[in-house]
Amino acid sequence: MAEQLDMGRLNLNDSQHAPQNGFNGERSAYIPPHLRGRPQGGPPPMNAAPPMMNGGGGVGGSAWGPAPGGPSPAPPARFDGPPPGQMNGGGNWANANAQAFTPRGRDGPQGGGGWGGAAPGKFDPSAYGKPGGGGGGSARGSGDGQWKDGKHVPGPSNPRVERELFGVPNDPSKQQTGINFEKYDDIPVEASGQGVPEPVTRFTNPPLDDHLLSNIELSGYKVPTPVQKYSIPIVMGGRDLMACAQTGSGKTGGFLFPILAQAFQNGPSPPPTAQAGGYGRQRKAYPTSLILAPTRELVSQIFDEARKFAYRSWVRPCVVYGGADIGSQLRQIERGCDLLVATPGRLVDLIERGRISLASIKYLVLDEADRMLDMGFEPQIRRIVEGEDMPPTAGRQTLMFSATFPRDIQMLARDFLKEYIFLSVGRVGSTSENITQKIEYVEDADKRSVLLDILHTHGAGLSLIFVETKRMADSLSDFLINQGFPATSIHGDRTQREREKALEMFRSGRCPILVATAVAARGLDIPNVTHVVNYDLPTDIDDYVHRIGRTGRAGNTGIATAFFNRGNRGVVRDLLDLLKEANQEVPSFLESIAREGSGFGGGGGRGGRGGGRGRGNAATRDVRRMGGGGGAGGFGGGGWGGAPQGGYGGGYGGAPAGGYAPPSGGAYGGGGGGGGGGGYGGGYGNPSGPGGNSWW
């Protein structure tokens, strides 16, 4: 064994650890490989100054001593940092010219000092509640803009962020202006109210801000849409607004443009005086603008638009919605939240947690307001608007946007809006003439085979197929996949990650067929959808309007096909009216079925609200200017001017002859002319009637 190891030739004095120069006859301490070969020397005296730490990074030098072969450094000053003017430091790990380590010396503009950042400044407890959570004046926002000395200072351009937000020319994932976009100028616009300002015709300063104009140009917008032409001067003039416009006509820009323009001009609001301070990030956010929308997809879409137009500004948009990790949303809010886009349920949750205050709100936007009420969000909305610390109606601007505003929603708006201007663009509650509507008579058993024929015929572009149930969405997408069509589905039971993945694959064209329930029907801006198929017709004509509005957006043309059979006769009258309004071909079987059903009345609109949401003029006109007039064959009617004979009754000026005035404590009951009986007697009843309960 000894011969194998050749122990005889081992000599401990040849070792790196052997004593050098007879140093007391003792072995030296272990020397790491990267320190071997340095000039030898004894340890410094105990009272010597600490060694310089100019870190020759890597193998050639130590992070804790002078560089190899370098001159002996002068003793550093005490722990007060480098001399002024020598603040080129950074970390002490890779720069051979770095200055001595300082725990917290004089931090210079180039990042000297151990923390390597901006000057910490003095502790200011009042700064920790401000938007952005203090931070000693550091840049913040969607880009890197700042509000400094009473002026908006935009941040530098970032090509990577620009590509992410605005895409590249002819990017298929971004909506391009369609061939009929210029025809929007021919759409009639009706604005009612006191002191309606003149519309604008171009994006200019004034009224908009120069920085916003540059972001609008980056987005590829050339001229304002009709709703934007009116909403910009109305909101910039400090007025409340209720706006109806065709889907895809620029409603989102209609409220984002004026809100952001005023934010860029006026700066952030001062924080409330009494705040609970915090260390590091702020504990509670004080947004100045709140945008409420009904679905996760819609708030995400609005947030993406807000990021575009707030690019390089001091405004930091945030989005919160249910079904996603609340921790990441809280961290986003803590970094600063000036413009908040939220679903009502998640916002109430964050308010209860004490993480959001509405005390600084200047602008409240309700997008797809009728849909939010239909989905049961009214208690949360009323709590947010009336039950928390939001300024009263007179202390904020309130904007309501939707493609339809039925009568009861307009009446509800009087609680939230003050002296508002009602804006109706085009045939609101109707559909775009850019959409070619086809109604096919198809029995349920034949729907799948007819759908395959349609997909074979209209194979190009993106196809969006609407069904009524979650089970049908998965079943139909599986069927299409088995038939060789790339399809995916989106509905309420899929996780947020799955829904976002499905939408991304659909938008990009990797999966050009999307089967969806109503969750994807309202407000989603999915560009370049060429064909919408209503595999299952909805029971509500407004839902049909919003579904087919996913195509024909921004002036593009599209096709909408609906499968109709006798099981859908409840919407036949409304469907007929809709086709005639949009100058579409009316199939003969629709008129035949409509005549069959005329005995039991149609046009009841959303029966769940007493039928008052029929397709009468109330869905498109300012209810303040109306004196009644029911929906076709429905309950409708009422209003401030009184109900027609036998109509629903229940107005704000008392129920005249024939209108339904509830008896004492009345709830449900008669009075319903026009077929179908009365709706909610006392529910929407006459507040001045004997014992009638006002719904609001």
UniProtKB/Swiss-Prot annotation:
Residues 68-85 have a biased composition (Pro residues). One of its GO terms (molecular function) is mRNA binding. It catalyses: ATP + H2O = ADP + phosphate + H(+). Its EC number is 3.6.4.13. It is found in: Cytoplasm. Keywords: ATP-binding, Cytoplasm, Helicase, Hydrolase, Initiation factor, Nucleotide-binding, Protein biosynthesis, RNA-binding. A motif (Q motif) lies at residues 201-229. Its main location: cytoplasm. Residues 54-63, 108-119, 130-144, 598-615, 666-696 have a biased composition (Gly residues). It comes from the Eukaryota. Residues 1-178, 597-622, 659-696 are annotated as: Disordered. Residues 232-423 form the Helicase ATP-binding domain. Residues 434-594 form the Helicase C-terminal domain. One of its GO terms (cellular component) is cytoplasm. ATP binds at residues 245-252. Residues 12-23 have a biased composition (Polar residues). InterPro entries: DEAD/DEAH_box_helicase_dom, Helicase_ATP-bd, Helicase_C-like, P-loop_NTPase, RNA-helicase_DEAD-box_CS, RNA_helicase_DEAD_Q_motif. SMART domains: DEXDc (SM00487), HELICc (SM00490). A motif (DEAD box) lies at residues 367-370. Disulfide bonds: none annotated. It holds the Pfam family DEAD. ATP-binding RNA helicase involved in translation initiation. Remodels RNA in response to ADP and ATP concentrations by facilitating disruption, but also formation of RNA duplexes. The Q motif is unique to and characteristic of the DEAD box family of RNA helicases and controls ATP binding and hydrolysis. Belongs to the DEAD box helicase family. DDX3/DED1 subfamily. This is ATP-dependent RNA helicase DED1.
